[in-house]
């Protein structure tokens, strides 16, 4: 909700850059851009509509340049980018320009499920790689840790 309010001015889950999936009862999984260090979405764009914001480390989409071809959607290992339901332009988390509204709302609400992790100089940043997976894969891994051998029955 915080994401769509920040970017759209209203609660609009279809336009939210953070998706939340409940794939196992009582286990909701946020799915958002990991701001991958190698960012395969950026070079996949044939018109260079995606760029790094050097101040925030976020991947930014130039809506004027985006042709809605979907190359970045296919290149993302986590399947995160999507075409905005109104503009049909590629949409990716832009970290709200520095302090993500989702992380702020999550902390203020006492959930502590999202937080901002400063980009590591290492190419093996676990915090970023966790979200660069599909919701099904993240949920399967979390369910396995929480429920052990019975996880497959729940999924």
For each feature predicted by the language model, list its residue ranges.
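Ordered, amphipathic secondary-structure segments that act as subunit-interaction surfaces
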Residues: 36-58
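The C-terminal cap of the DNA-recognition helix in HTH/winged-HTH DNA-binding domains
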Residues: 5, 46-47, 77
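A generic, residue-level signal for flexible/boundary positions that often mark functional hotspots
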Residues: 12, 27-30, 55
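N-terminal cysteine/histidine-rich coordination modules
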Residues: 1-24
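Flanking helices and flexible, charged tails adjoining ferredoxin-like Fe-S electron-transfer domains
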Residues: 17-20, 24-35, 42, 64-155
């Amino acid at each position: 909700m915080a994401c769509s309010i920040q970017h759209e001015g209203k609660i609009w889950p279809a336009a939210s850059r953070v998706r939340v999936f409940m794939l196992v009862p009582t286990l909701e999984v946020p799915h958002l851009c990991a701001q991958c260090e190698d960012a395969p979405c950026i070079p996949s764009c044939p018109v260079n509509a995606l760029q790094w914001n050097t101040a925030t480390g976020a991947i930014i989409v130039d809506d004027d340049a985006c042709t809605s071809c979907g190359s970045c959607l296919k290149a993302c290992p986590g399947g995160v980018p999507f075409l905005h339901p109104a503009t049909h332009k590629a949409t990716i988390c832009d970290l709200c320009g520095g302090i993500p509204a989702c992380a702020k709302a999550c902390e203020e609400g006492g959930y502590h499920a999202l937080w901002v992790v400063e980009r590591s100089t290492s190419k093996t940043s676990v915090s970023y790689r966790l979200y660069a997976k599909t919701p099904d894969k993240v949920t399967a891994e979390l369910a396995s840790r929480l429920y052990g051998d019975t996880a497959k029955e729940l999924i």
